[in-house]
Structure formats: C-alpha cells, structure tokens
C-alpha cells in the first residue's frame, strides 16, 4: 500500500512514490512531495526532451540540463531545495 502525500505539482493529496526515484537531497524532496501521477507526467515530458533535443544521458552537461528542466516542470522556475 502506497502512502498518501500532498503533491506540490498537482496541489492535492495523491498516492506517493513507492521508493525514491532520484539521488541525493533532491531525490528525497521529490519522494516526499511529488505523487506517482506527477512523476509519470514528468517521465513522459523527460522522454520528449531527450528525444527532441538529442540529449545524451552519458554527458554530464545534458544531465544537468535535464535536471534543471525537471525542477522547473515539477516545482516552478524559482525552486531551490534550500528554501524548502
């Protein structure tokens, strides 16, 4: 049985993720504040971004771009883990 969390993306209570899906402090924050539905929406968007921009996940610069886009998508432009 999954936990219910307040999803900051959906702005309502929803089923949380089964396990952390991203490393580090950001991953912990995502696990605690992003629902399974919101994460699936991000995965769809992520696939589009990787394909359209021909991002290479072996390239650190491309991974940095994708992480920035993830933060904007899930939390908004002014998100900082330090402020939350």
Swiss-Prot record:
A GO term from the CC aspect: cytosol
Alphabetical list of InterPro entries matching this protein: Fe_traffick_prot_YggX, Fe_traffick_prot_YggX_sf
GO terms, biological process: cellular response to oxidative stress
Keyword Cell membrane (UniProt): no
Keyword Iron assigned: yes
Keywords, ordered alphabetically: Iron
Subunit description: Monomer.
Family (UniProt): Belongs to the Fe(2+)-trafficking protein family.
Protein name per UniProt: Probable Fe(2+)-trafficking protein
Species, as recorded: Blochmanniella pennsylvanica (strain BPEN)
Lineage, highest ranks first: Bacteria, Pseudomonadati, Pseudomonadota, Gammaproteobacteria, Enterobacterales
């Amino acid at each position: 049985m999954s936990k219910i969390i307040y999803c900051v993306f959906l702005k309502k209570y929803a089923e949380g993720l089964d396990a952390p899906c991203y490393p580090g402090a950001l991953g912990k924050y995502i696990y605690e504040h992003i629902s399974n539905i919101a994460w699936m929406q991000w995965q769809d968007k992520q696939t589009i971004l990787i394909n359209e921009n021909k991002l290479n996940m072996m390239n650190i610069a491309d991974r940095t771009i994708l992480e920035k886009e993830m933060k904007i998508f899930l939390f908004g432009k002014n998100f900082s883990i330090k402020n939350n």
